Amino acid sequence: MRSDRIKKGFERAPHRSLLRATGLNDGDFEKPFIGIANSHIDIIPGHYYLQEYGRIAKDEIRKAGGVPFEFNTIGVDDGIAMGHEGMKYSLPSRELIADSIETVMNAHQLDALVCIPNCDKIVPGMLMGALRVNVPTVFVSGGPMKAGHLHDGTPIDLNTAFEAVGKRAQGQLTDAELYEIECQACPSGGSCSGMFTANSMNVLCEAMGVALPGNGTVLALTPEREALVRRAARRAVEIAADERFKLRNIANRDAIHNAMVVDMAMGGSSNTVLHMLAISREAGAPLSLRDIEEIAGKVAHIAKIAPSLATVHMEDIHRAGGVPAVLREAARRGGSVREGALTVTGETVGERIRDARTADPELIRPLENAYSPVGGLAVLFGNLAAEGAVVKTAGIQPSMRRFTGAAICFDSQDEAIAGIMGGKVKPGHFVVIRYEGPKGGPGMQEMLSPTSLIMGMGLGESVALVTDGRFSGATRGACVGHVSPEAAEGGVIGLVQDGDRITIDVEARALTVDVPDAELARRREGFRPKRRDPGSSWLRRYAHLVTNAANGAVLRSTDL
């Protein structure tokens, strides 16, 4: 066992002495040492109860013949960090989480790992760190929260609350109506109830085979979720000494392909593209945006979940058959799903989905009745995004799939929010928010506040938005993000001027600004990208090391 390096031989007597101080005895030194990476944190609704799941996992590991060692990571709630300078820390937290997993696991030479994440950057951060460690690993998330409901039974979620702010600003909601939404949108613990970033990533873990069936859709704080935690912990002990289940053997190229298939079939958050680019690099099977676009062209969009379809939430998809049913339906298009991929249970993906059935063909549609013959995410290219940009096509109104508008430019999210609230943004505008990329922000803030204001103020079918920042999984509308190169590295988005005509064409996979090359070259003369001092040594280091969104916003490992 790997842990023999800290517990076997006379020269390890000091190490064993320290371990005995934690309660270990002679018999424990013959057992596998299992790490539990828990992301319990009180301020996040999807994480405040994970301490109990950690306790359950430790109990099950002991019963199964292992020795558990729990440790914690940090976590950032993107919803609470939204719309102020706190959002600059969200994406960078992914790197801290990955580094902390690598540090604890390798410093103590633990044999296997159980990861208990749930929300936003915590899932990809744990995956990235666990892939570096490359021991047998099982993921089990905290699970999605229930959908909220208004007094008349209308289902709502966190996105409803964000869009309600725009409606209140327009006088379309009373304070009492806004208060009801505030109090009912998030009715329980768990990751926010739609196909937002957290649930998208937990679904992708299941599709990759690094988590057990049900990981993406079983509700939080239910007996079914607790049973999933117990099974995951026992499985970690069972596979601790089996090299077949080292994480890179499970999360390989085929598994990453299957994750993107489910992402396209379910119209996941655009953040998944950013994270899967980074995860694939740690797995040694790097994806490119071109690869992702190729997968999107071969996978039908068969399930719509909030925010794309406001009445459907994760609990509904679970009742309809969950991720196995989505994979089984997607597999009917020959070659779409890599069915031979091994999962952490020891089954192949094909074996896992063989008996899956769709209980509601309106929630998980057959290929013949798909929402679209291609995936719910798209990668766009053009003179405004030479290295690529990403749009969640599942959330775009049909009338906005091809749109040309006059640019109205803002050099920060705060400027954009003030401009939208102040009435500067009119029908026919193409809002440009720049200097919000990984380097320029720094931190690549999510633009949920401005996009929700646009929707809430009734501009969703007459205004588009483009940014080198990113979006919450709750964003919907004609919103293009991840523009690369970003403004801070001299991208064309930094050269756009008010009034320039910008076109998004989803079918053509194009994002262009109607400015001649000669004029762009003239504007570039003397152009100096703006530089912001974030006032933080960590964010300064991050801005110096981070790559752009087309590269997954990973940190360079050289040029320190």
From Swiss-Prot:
**Which keywords has UniProt assigned to this entry?**
2Fe-2S, Amino-acid biosynthesis, Branched-chain amino acid biosynthesis, Iron, Iron-sulfur, Lyase, Magnesium, Metal-binding
Query: Reaction catalysed?
Result: (2R)-2,3-dihydroxy-3-methylbutanoate = 3-methyl-2-oxobutanoate + H2O; (2R,3R)-2,3-dihydroxy-3-methylpentanoate = (S)-3-methyl-2-oxopentanoate + H2O
Per its UniProt record, what Pfam families does this chain match?
A: ILV_EDD_C, ILVD_EDD_N
Pathway per its UniProt entry is:
Amino-acid biosynthesis; L-isoleucine biosynthesis; L-isoleucine from 2-oxobutanoate: step 3/4; Amino-acid biosynthesis; L-valine biosynthesis; L-valine from pyruvate: step 3/4
Instruction: Look up the record and name the cofactor or cofactors this protein needs.
Output: [2Fe-2S] cluster; Mg(2+)
- Report the PROSITE patterns cross-referenced here: ILVD_EDD_1, ILVD_EDD_2
The Gene Ontology biological process terms listed for this entry are: isoleucine biosynthetic process; L-valine biosynthetic process
Q: Where is the active site?
A: 472
Q: Which residues carry this modification: N6-carboxylysine?
A: 121
Q: Name one GO cellular component term.
A: cytosol
Q: According to the UniProt entry, what is the EC number of this protein?
A: 4.2.1.9
The cofactor remark states: Binds 1 [2Fe-2S] cluster per subunit. This cluster acts as a Lewis acid cofactor.
- Domain of life per record: Bacteria
How the protein assembles, per its UniProt entry? Homodimer.
Q: What does this protein do?
A: Functions in the biosynthesis of branched-chain amino acids. Catalyzes the dehydration of (2R,3R)-2,3-dihydroxy-3-methylpentanoate (2,3-dihydroxy-3-methylvalerate) into 2-oxo-3-methylpentanoate (2-oxo-3-methylvalerate) and of (2R)-2,3-dihydroxy-3-methylbutanoate (2,3-dihydroxyisovalerate) into 2-oxo-3-methylbutanoate (2-oxoisovalerate), the penultimate precursor to L-isoleucine and L-valine, respectively.
Q: What is this protein called?
A: Dihydroxy-acid dehydratase
* Species whose genome carries this gene: Anaeromyxobacter sp. (strain K)
